[in-house]
Curated annotation (Swiss-Prot):
Species this chain originates from: Bos taurus (Bovine)
GO cellular component, one term: nucleus
Chief location bin: nucleus
Protein name: Bifunctional peptidase and arginyl-hydroxylase JMJD5
Phylogenetic lineage: Eukaryota, Metazoa, Chordata, Craniata, Vertebrata
Assigned keywords, A-Z: Aminopeptidase, Biological rhythms, Cell cycle, Chromatin regulator, Chromosome, Dioxygenase, Hydrolase, Iron, Metal-binding, Nucleus, Oxidoreductase, Protease, Transcription, Transcription regulation
PROSITE patterns registered for this protein in UniProt: JMJC (PS51184)
Amino acid sequence: MAGPSTLWETLQALLPHTKEELKLELGEKVEGSVLMLLQEAAELFLGGQRRECLQTCEVLLDYSWEKLNTGPWQHVDKDWRRVYAFGCLLKAVCLCEPPGDAASVAAALKACDMGLLMGAAILGDILLKVAAVLQKYLLSGKRPAPGPSQEPPGTKKARNDHVPIPDVTTERTVPRLHCPSLQYFKKHFLVPGRPVILEGVANHWPCMKKWSLEYIQEVAGCRTVPVEVGSRYTDEEWSQTLMTVNEFISKYIREEPKDIGYLAQHQLFDQIPELKQDISIPDYCCLGDGEEEEITINAWFGPQGTVSPLHQDPQQNFLAQVMGRKYIRLYSPQESEALYPHDTHLLHNTSQVDVENPDLEKFPRFAEAPFLSCVLSPGEVLFIPVKHWHYVRALDLSFSVSFWWS
C-alpha cells in the first residue's frame, strides 16, 4: 500500500489551491450564513487547519442534509446539493491528512459516496476522481489471495429457498433472435413495440466471465450504495437505507435475513467506473434519438426472490442478465385497464395486481389480459419496449443491467 503521504500528495494534485478556484458561488436559495460557513471551511482547509475544517464541514453537512430531506426529492434546489457535495469533498480530504489510517480513508470514501449519491456535480466531477483515488488506495492494502478454505462464488450461505420456477412452456413466450441486424430489429421490434430476447449480443462482455460475489466485493465492496429493504416497493413496510456493498452482501445474500434486500435501479456504473469497463452499451441503442450520454444505465443486484411489481417505464429498455436467472412477464400498454394501475400519482405506473398470486375477485379483468413471458438467463438481453408493463422475479442470486434510452 502506498503511504498516507503519497495519498495526500495525489489528492492535493486534484484539488484547487485557492478559494477562487473552488467556485463557491451559489444561488439565492442558499442562505448567506451558510455560504459564509462554506467559505470559512474552505479558508480553514486551504490554511492547513484541517481539524477545524472538519468540524465546520460537519455543521454544514448536518444543515444541508436537513434541506435535502425536506419535501419531494425533485423539488430540492440543486444549490443545496452543491453545498452538501462541497461539505463531503472537504470532509473527505481532511480525513486523509497524514498519518491517515485505513479507517480514516474508508470514512473519507464514504463521505465521497454520500456526496455522489445526494449531492450535485462540482468542480468537474471531482468527487468521482477523489473516490477513485481512495478506492485504489484501500484496495492496494487488502487484496486477499483466494485460499483453499474459500468456497466458490455465492455458495457460502447464499439464500437457497427453492423458489418456484414457472413453467414458461405453458405460456406465450417472448421470441428470441441471435444478433439480428440493426435494420431488422428496428423494423420488426422497435417500431411496432414488440418485446424480443437478443442472444449472442452480450456474451463477449467481460462481466460475463469476471463477475462473482468475490469480484464485486473486491471492486465495489467498500462503496456506499442505496439498498431497498422489503419484498416489493408497493408494500407498506418497504424502506430504503444506505450501506456498503460488503455489508449488503453479508446481510442480504450470505446470510438468511427476515427481509429481502435489493440494490435496485442504481446508477452504480457512474459511481464505480471499474465496473462500467466490464459492460457495453448494446449497439441497438444507436437507433434512438438521444446521445450515448443520455442512456441511463442501472444496476439490479440481489438475492433470489427479489420482485419488481408489474409496472411500466417511460423509455425503451434493454435488460441484460449477467448473473442468475429472472422470470419476466410482459403486457402490452393496450392492456393497461385490465392491469388496474394504482390511482395515486406516485404509483400510477404500477399495477395493483400481485401477478403470480392475483386476487381475481378484486381484479377480474386481469385473468383475460394476454401476456408474454420468459426466463432470462446470463448473456441474454431482453428488449422491453417503452410503456410495456413488466413484472420481474429473481430465480437465483442475480445481477442485471438495464439500459434506458429514448
